[in-house]
């Protein structure tokens, strides 16, 4: 009963906070807040610089590979367990997934900076 009550209160509280976060910014809509400010003058150039999509994709790829490698770090301690076959199977699956994703990135030309 306590678990259900706690989950219900947490769900209700988080839903209320999300709804408040969506409704409050819509009450104060000012065009001045969304425009670039340059000392009261009209802007000389656009303040919205284009972002390189290639850089973004390389950064996301780095984060994914970094997380997968972080999963490999506990393997030396896991090798001391009694169930060595399961540990080796999981390590092989993880390394295979890492190699397959690297091969996919390579074939899709995701690792080449210049086009």
From Swiss-Prot:
GO terms for cellular component: mitochondrial inner membrane; NADH dehydrogenase complex. It is a multi-pass membrane protein. The chain crosses the membrane at residues 3-23, 55-75, 86-106. It is found in: Mitochondrion inner membrane. It catalyses: a ubiquinone + NADH + 5 H(+)(in) = a ubiquinol + NAD(+) + 4 H(+)(out). Gene3D superfamilies: NADH:ubiquinone/plastoquinone oxidoreductase, chain 3. Disulfide bonds: none annotated. Its main location: mitochondrion. Keywords: Electron transport, Membrane, Mitochondrion, Mitochondrion inner membrane, NAD, Respiratory chain, Translocase, Transmembrane, Transmembrane helix, Transport, Ubiquinone. GO terms for molecular function: NADH dehydrogenase (ubiquinone) activity. InterPro entries: NADH_UbQ/plastoQ_OxRdtase_su3, NDAH_ubi_oxred_su3_sf. GO terms for biological process: mitochondrial electron transport, NADH to ubiquinone. Its EC number is 7.1.1.2. PANTHER family: NADH-UBIQUINONE OXIDOREDUCTASE CHAIN 3. Belongs to the complex I subunit 3 family. Core subunit of the mitochondrial membrane respiratory chain NADH dehydrogenase (Complex I) which catalyzes electron transfer from NADH through the respiratory chain, using ubiquinone as an electron acceptor. Essential for the catalytic activity of complex I. This is NADH-ubiquinone oxidoreductase chain 3. It comes from Rhinoceros unicornis. The lineage of its organism: Eukaryota, Metazoa, Chordata, Craniata, Vertebrata.
């Amino acid at each position: 009963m306590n678990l259900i009550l706690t989950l219900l209160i947490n769900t209700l509280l988080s839903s209320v906070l999300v709804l408040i976060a969506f409704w409050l910014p819509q009450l104060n809509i000012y065009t001045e807040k969304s425009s670039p400010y340059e000392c009261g003058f009209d802007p000389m150039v656009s303040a919205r610089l284009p972002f390189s999509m290639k850089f973004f994709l390389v950064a996301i790829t780095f984060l994914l590979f970094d997380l997968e490698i972080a999963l490999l770090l506990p393997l030396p301690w896991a090798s001391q367990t009694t169930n060595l076959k399961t540990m080796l199977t999981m390590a092989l699956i993880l390394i295979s997934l890492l190699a397959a994703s690297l091969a996919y990135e390579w074939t899709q030309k995701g690792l080449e900076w210049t086009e």
